[in-house]
Structure formats: C-alpha cells, structure tokens
Design a protein with these regions (language model features):
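NAD(P)-dependent Rossmann-like dehydrogenase/reductase catalytic/cofactor-binding core
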Residues: 5, 53-146
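Internal alpha-helical scaffold of NAD(P)-dependent oxidoreductase catalytic cores
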Residues: 1-75
C-alpha cells in the first residue's frame, strides 16, 4: 500500500467485511430508488431539495439498521459527506435501478431497500421511507417503462 501511495494511489482497508457490505448498502439504499422513480441522474440528489431530503431519511434509516446489526457505519459523523462527495463525482450517471425501470427490466429493490426493510422488521424497527420506496418501485415495475 505504501508503494501505491507514493504514485498517488491511496487505498484503505475496511474494518470488516460486514462494515463494507453495510457501507455499500447505505450508498445504494439512499440514492438508487429515489433517483430511479424520478428518472434522474445522481446529481439530482444534491440539486433538488425534495430528493435530498429523501436521501437523508433513507441514509439515516440504513445507519440505524446497521447499528442494530452491530455495525457502526458512521463513527466519525462523515458518512453523509463521503456519499455526497461520491455523488458529485458521479453526478451524470444514471444508476442501474433507474435504467432497469426505464427499460422495463426487473430492479434490485428487494435486494437493496427490501433487505433493509426485512432486517428492520427482524429488530422491530420501523423504516417508513425504505418501505415507501420499496412499494413505489414495485408498483412502477408492474406498469413497465414510462
């Protein structure tokens, strides 16, 4: 890792595999479904207040469930800024769920937000924003591309 750092490649190791999986889930769960339903690229999350509010609620619910699972995703309080930095870097990208909805293909909603809903139920915790988006994406999927 040191040699890579000397040439400008900076890597870090995740504390655990479970932490890395939850971190990826936080990224996907907080942005894929709202952008898919809106049919917009990643940057819209930072440009449109309503989408940004949804992003924050989804992120907070995901962090809560990860914590219930024994994983502290945001020990230094910087998770939101780190994800927003990634959003800025990929602002023009259309996520896979948005592409799937637009093309009438199955989405990964049950494996992303649906998984958070299931883990929340296991812990007796309500995640209304995740549940709302699971329902909305499923409903949109039934009606095909718009």
């Amino acid at each position: 890792l040191e040699a890579l750092g000397e040439i400008g490649v900076h890597l870090s190791c995740a504390p655990t595999l479970q932490w890395a999986e939850w971190r990826k889930a936080a990224w996907n769960a907080s942005m894929n479904a709202p952008l898919a339903l809106a049919g917009l690229t990643n940057g819209a999350l930072l440009e449109q207040p309503e989408l940004h509010d949804t992003f924050i609620r989804l992120l907070n619910e995901t962090v809560l469930i990860a914590r219930a699972e024994g994983v502290d995703l945001d020990p230094n309080g910087q998770l939101q800024e780190q994800i927003e930095s990634s959003i800025r870097a990929t602002a023009r990208n259309l996520n896979s769920m948005a592409a799937a909805l637009a093309q009438g293909r199955p989405t990964e909603i049950d494996w992303i937000n649906g998984a958070i809903v299931r883990r929340a139920a296991h812990h007796g915790i309500s995640v209304p924003e995740n549940q709302r988006l699971v329902n909305a994406v499923r409903a949109r999927s039934l009606h095909g591309p718009r």
